[in-house]
């Protein structure tokens, strides 16, 4: 059985770019999305890895996460986890309702916690590996208008730091990338040209992620790396 790179949140624009980038390097990828099979994952057969596994799971459900990882265990030893699950909604502290707050914390932070916990339990026994989480520029510079989202992403960064410290004795690296605005079809549809002027293509971020989970990045752990360009 070959080493796997697990990509959670693989159906989104960034997820598809990451899966395609890894597949382009002929790596074995377990692409996880909420609903599977997803025909959008690596649509070009020329970029298909030797083994591309399409898996489905509700990553906000701890029991379903454990079921997912039991399935992954049958596919091979995990070399790296790329955790891209998340979502955005605006709102100030004073006008964010309970449902929106809980949804953003669950989608951005809780999913990351459960998936990282399952991965860490396995990687710590291997003596090698990598975990890559996705934070946000707003986690460092929380401006007005995205309160719950910024708090959730700040939690992702702190979780990344804690895991990096906990897994250091096992030589498992844990890092995060910090996007700003990503140039995706959804953002193009909802944002004006001015807001998109400095947007970064998902393919560019995918190349950074691919490097960070590779053995070439072995000296890097506990880092929060900006990938928002000049925007």
Name each model-derived stretch:
Residues 136:
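Residue(s) in the substrate-gating loop at a strand-loop-helix junction
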Residues 84-90:
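Conserved NAD(P)H cofactor-binding loop of Rossmann-fold oxidoreductase domains
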